[in-house]
Amino acid sequence: MAQGEFALLRESLEPALQLSGQPIQRGTMAHEHTVCMMLVEAATMARDEAVLGRYAPKLEELAKRDGHLPYLGIAHRALGVAHRLAGELAEAEARLKQALELFQGMQAGWQVGRTLRELAELDLARSDRAAALGHFGRALEAFEALGAAPDAERTRQALAAIL
């Protein structure tokens, strides 16, 4: 996601967090945790440390409150990325492993693949090319098993860049 696209998305979503109340009917308005999740996912893709620092802890809080395991996994992954961007590699690994465990337990293959990609990025930050190849390879397998062509292609490109 380009920085300009992320800025537009953020401009559109942040005001929704100021709205009070819950939807009158299911599906008529995004819940706070849904808006936070969208901001966190976009910030993760944009590698925006400031937005991750602002919304990932909130998403984690809301996911724990609501017992929403998919959003909790997304929050852990986002916090892992934020820690990696800040150079806090041990904290990043802990968060990414928490996310991976949650997603594997839910058999959420696409989320598993995305988390494995982030673990590969962490490996690269540690200059551990062999581990990165392993994580990218497992991510590629997950994406191919699902037919997630765009993610599989991005992963192939990442693999080619380090071969």
What are the roles of these predicted feature ranges?
Residues 1-163:
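Helix-coil-helix junctions within alpha-helical repeat/solenoid scaffolds
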